[in-house]
Amino acid sequence: MKPNPILSKMSKVEKQFFEWYKEVDPSSAYTDGVSECAGKFFIPSKQNLAVAENKLRNILKEAKNKGQRRLFKSYLTSLRFNEPYMVPSHATNAFFAHLVKEGIVSEHLKSLAKKVEEALDAYAKLLPDKKWSIETRIVTCQTTDQLLGILDTILAETKDESLKKSLNVLKQKALKYRKLYEVKGIKQGDFSEIYPILQKTREKIKHKTIYPQLLADMWGYPETSEEIENKATFWLEKELPSLKKVTSKLAKIYGVKPTVEIVAEELNKRKGIPIQQALQFVKETRTVAQKIFEKNIVRITPKYETRVIETPPYLVNMIPTAAMSNFNSLTDKPFNVFFVTTDPRFSPSSSVPDLIQSLLHEEYGHSVNFSNSATRFAANPTFLEIMSSAFSTPITDGISFHREFEFVKLLEKLVEKKTLSSEEAAFLKTLRGEVDTETMLLENEFVMQKWRIMRFLRAIFDVRINMEKQSIADFVEWAHKETGLSKKMIYNQTWIFLETVGYAPCYSIVGDVIRKLQQCALKKGISLQDFNTYVSSLGFPAREIFEQKINEFISRHAK
């Protein structure tokens, strides 16, 4: 494995930042493919954070363009935002990255365990006095349980006694850390335990003073919190009738009451895949689906590699349905891991349309986006623009969100096509099952519309919770009454964003931007494939630069 050729093109200030990045976020650098960072973890002491901030400020002074300044400011903002769930969460990700990339290498894992132990001590000292909300305490317990879970996984696999000793020492430290934030009654950390507590307490999370800055500077939203809530509320009101309409049509076909929850249950009965077969279904279907998406939606780099795995037990609290992680973007062999959750306590995809929805979102949205960008397949992102910074999240989730809409439109075209390829015919057969074409289209539209509504709710949730407008229980009750979606699903699909304040609006906010730009490109004679391939290869610059580059592409290629 060799370094990504882009590293040889770094400017002086990019090289300075890269050295800072390896020092301050070595676990992410290792995930990106920097082998020298194996076994390393940043110790977030007050002194280390101050030194890191001072160094980055000096690098910021050397920035030569807006893109560099925006990214460095994003990292500066994140340095100042520290909450107790962060170190356990980052530590779990670090251990997981080591297992995925190299398996159990005792020296690296012993070093990592020691560093994480020091980091937990440092964080306990850094955040000792603040009275944290019960929600923050629960999330901290959950992320610490994830860390304990992955440690147990390694302990069960390794025969190295010195590694076992190091991991057991870290386990005791993590248990001690967890007790600092312990909430009585939380063991599994699922809906059945947590939601009754939220109904009783109805606390508000104190983020009102920091939230606007996180949106603007860390995540790079041009929109204010008020604009995000207004947009998402408008979309919810606009598209909810579409969900209700398709729900009524399916309910009539199924012979059930026309509610989202009942129709979803009936869809699972009719098109359900047994939990133990869900992973294999995804693996088999993706081989056919990839050819269809590449032919009709987006071209894919020849270096594309994605591995599909079942979500490990220690991650299901934060991956209730599906997720994707990218690795080795700074090497010549980037790859992705696609997680499929099957645990019934959460919100796993269990029907054919739901599993296809997860597949197209995670693979032909996220995975293609990261792979095309890392390999500079159809664009020329800079070193800073292929990093998995906070800026990557709005862009890649916006792409994936819009990909779901594109898929339903593609299905409508395929069923009208006179001559299908063997892959297209096989794919439609899988989707149809034993129903007619009209019912199949309605089922996939239903799933797409249901998830669009959920993404609008996520955006509203993020603003209302973090601007202290509602408690989580109040929001869930409002959203359930407003949409007909189950309280469990709403909770599972919003609670996870407490760990990443400001993330949740990205799907719908950026997805709508991409939709409008795509419409403009199509009107000017640019093909859907050409547009999507370019956008998926652009990397992850600040939003305004991302949009500017797309507009320039449209101007260059208009016919």
Regions found by a protein language model. Give the residues of each.
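N-terminal maturation segment of proteins
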Residues: 1-559
